[in-house]
């Protein structure tokens, strides 16, 4: 059994929304961590049907339970009308809920009761390196870190099914877009720009839609947890900076599949993009799991110098290179950044196995970086 890092107290006092993309392992995680809870699975069509027809059945079922009883409702967005009953049970009976879902969009879109701030959000991500005893970097770069894909003998088939199910159940059945074929084309174009600065106009031309529609498509990807934007760090008075965010799919395996990448080879541009994506993916999960208030951003000057990851208010700047030997030319972006933010801690993460300092810049092998990240932080 792989132990997940996502921290939810065994003695839970406050209710939570547990969000995570499909197949991140939410149900398995909750069943293992809270085996004695009352568990309601709304993916069971019979159970879903009964609660859909009569949401008050939940109150009747639970109103005689003791104060502090833990109730898990899996895939609450399937029957969001239950949230009124949940709110009532929390207020009147003192029950504690974990409300699980792979998309917050259904709740936002229809204006359902989100419990008035009485349940705080927690996110479960794909595997991170520290959760896997014999972490395989190449496996992660090729197929991503979703549990069924990383552990599978035939991940290609599973990745294909993943995208098909996403389009059918998250997009088509919820009528989130008018033209499913256009949206599918957008998914592929978005994969081509994975890790790049978003340009809605260029993507709109490639997809044959308006720039506003492209912006809405990106919102759908974020709300259904299939992707995320990384904002630009722009706090400076010294130079002109790029303002637009970058976009990443939530898991590198999904991006690879959309781009029809198979076995990635070190030294290629494709490998470099995937390598960077994996590090960004790991940093995002780390910040969330440690409940940090610091933001993940990137920095890019109009003159071309850039830094792939900035943590917090320029506390740490990280360049990510899939090279096997760090050379002075790889440090240009960090040096330019340091001239504007001299107090920043500077790191370059790479495949170079020799950890060392080059001036003020620390060179760290990727696996050592991951170990440090989860053991002592950065």
Segments from the language model and where they lie:
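Accessory nucleic acid-recognition modules appended to NTPase machines
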Residues: 158-315, 322
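Conserved lysine of the Walker
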Residues: 26-27
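Short glycine-rich substrate-engagement loop in P-loop NTPases that contacts/grips substrate
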Residues: 40-70
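Short regulatory helix/loop adjacent to the ATP-binding pocket of P-loop NTPases
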Residues: 105-120
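Structural recognition of the conserved hydrophobic beta-strand(s) that form the central parallel beta-sheet
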Residues: 72, 96-102
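Hydrophobic anchor at the beta1->P-loop junction of P-loop NTPases
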Residues: 18
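Pre-Walker A adenine-sensing motif
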Residues: 1-11
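Domain-level recognition of nuclease-like catalytic cores that cleave nucleotide substrates
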Residues: 353-378
